[in-house]
């Protein structure tokens, strides 16, 4: 007997949606100089975007183009990406601090046309933002979401034509959360969570079927208030708070799908996940805090003198630099507020060499190095996301 739930598998593509898919595909082909990559140029994937954007094709096309350029710049491409993600040099050093699913798509439900994803919430938010630059964490979340998408796309290639898009089901464990840490919406870790949520909702729409919050705090009203900061109204409707863990496998999901820790029958035996399938994180100490400007020392130079720029509300500042043949770039910056940051070749925002990311530098500066920019004009773009306040920017760019 199936578990009782309001959320079943995603509906198959309708005739009306097929017409929209053809229209959106044509718009994207016109906008993208290299066309749509084959892996994401499927009817089911474009259907996900159309459903997620509710007919706002202008916003859809803009975000799809930025997503593709950012994916390429981050190196999150290739048929084996799902297998190599956890080994990437930009990802591997931070995995010890993150407790997230290693189940891939193994816990699969035909009834839901979805697989299970399990994550444990941060236990040390104040230390976390001293250990990760905003871009470090966003790139991890970006890459992880892309890995899940690739698993979805593989499933969709094999399924029958009468099925809808594949999705995943989230169990999000709040056991280690002190909800009062999240009362201040302006805190650095609240902002980081907000930006993370914005990224997956913008670039990976309609991939999540349902979000089950387990081990919730007693202050449920405060929990809903916090959730509203992170999620769209549509994704808020996907949340189910599980106060009694026996309900998860009794009322909502089949017992064989749910880890034993959450009242089900499943016990993971595949490393590096624990019995729930989640990687085991270690405690962050002060020795783990990020040390800025090390990339200058590693290349044997002192940090050059910084430049300053005031960026008016909602305006962009673009700094251009010509990189000679055989040279590379080192850079860093801090900003007084939130900004959209990207690095691209010349004037072509579709040719990103660093992903377009919404960033903050509350605790740590942003910095990095670029090796693949020899003999190119490179543009650093800083967009002030505030409509009211001037952004005070301090930045350094060095050629070596």
UniProtKB/Swiss-Prot annotation:
Residues 304-399 form the GOLD domain. Residues 87-270 form the CRAL-TRIO domain. Gene3D superfamilies: CRAL-TRIO lipid binding domain, GOLD domain. It comes from Caenorhabditis elegans. This is CRAL-TRIO domain-containing protein C34C12.6. It holds the Pfam family CRAL_TRIO. The lineage of its organism: Eukaryota, Metazoa, Ecdysozoa, Nematoda, Chromadorea. PANTHER family: CRAL-TRIO DOMAIN-CONTAINING PROTEIN C34C12.6, SEC14 RELATED PROTEIN. InterPro entries: CRAL-TRIO_dom (IPR001251), CRAL-TRIO_dom_sf (IPR036865), GOLD_dom (IPR009038), SEC14/CRAL-TRIO_domain (IPR051064). It comes from the Eukaryota. One of its GO terms (cellular component) is cytoplasm.
């Amino acid at each position: 007997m199936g578990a009782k739930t309001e959320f079943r598998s995603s509906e198959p593509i309708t005739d009306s949606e097929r017409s929209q898919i053809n229209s959106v595909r044509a718009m994207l082909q016109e906008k993208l100089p290299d066309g749509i990559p084959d892996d994401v140029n499927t009817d089911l994937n474009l259907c996900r975007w159309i459903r997620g954007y509710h007919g706002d094709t202008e916003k859809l096309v803009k975000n799809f183009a930025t997503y593709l350029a950012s994916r390429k710049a981050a190196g999150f491409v290739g048929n084996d990406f799902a297998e190599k993600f956890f080994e990437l040099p930009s990802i591997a050093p931070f995995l010890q601090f993150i407790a997230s699913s290693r189940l891939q798509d193994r816990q699969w439900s035909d009834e839901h046309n979805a697989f299970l994803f399990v994550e444990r919430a941060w236990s040390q938010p104040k230390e976390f933002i001293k250990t990760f630059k905003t871009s470090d964490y966003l790139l991890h979340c970006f890459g992880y979401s892309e890995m899940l998408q690739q698993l979805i796309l593989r499933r969709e290639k094999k399924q029958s034509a009468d099925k809808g898009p594949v999705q995943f089901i989230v169990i999000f464990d709040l056991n280690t959360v002190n909800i009062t840490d999240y009362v201040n919406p302006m805190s650095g870790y609240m902002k980081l969570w907000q930006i993370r949520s914005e990224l997956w909702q913008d670039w990976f729409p309609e991939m999540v079927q349902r979000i089950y919050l387990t081990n919730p705090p007693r202050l449920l009203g405060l929990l809903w208030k916090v959730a509203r900061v992170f999620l769209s109204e549509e994704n808020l409707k996907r949340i189910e708070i599980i106060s009694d863990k026996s309900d998860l496998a009794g009322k909502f999901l089949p017992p064989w799908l749910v880890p034993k820790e959450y009242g089900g029958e499943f016990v993971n035996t595949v490393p590096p996940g624990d019995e729930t399938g989640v990687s085991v994180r270690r405690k962050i100490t002060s020795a783990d805090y990020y040390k800025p400007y090390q990339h200058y020392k590693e290349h044997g130079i002192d940090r050059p003198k910084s430049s300053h720029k005031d960026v008016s509300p909602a305006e962009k500042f673009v700094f251009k630099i010509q990189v000679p043949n055989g040279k590379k770039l080192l850079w860093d910056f801090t900003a007084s507020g939130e900004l959209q940051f990207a690095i691209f070749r010349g004037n072509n925002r579709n040719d990103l060499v660093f992903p377009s990311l919404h960033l903050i530098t509350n605790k740590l500066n942003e910095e990095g190095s670029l090796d693949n920019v020899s003999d190119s004009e490179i543009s650093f773009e800083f967009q002030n996301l505030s409509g009211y306040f001037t952004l005070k920017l301090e930045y350094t760019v060095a050629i070596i």
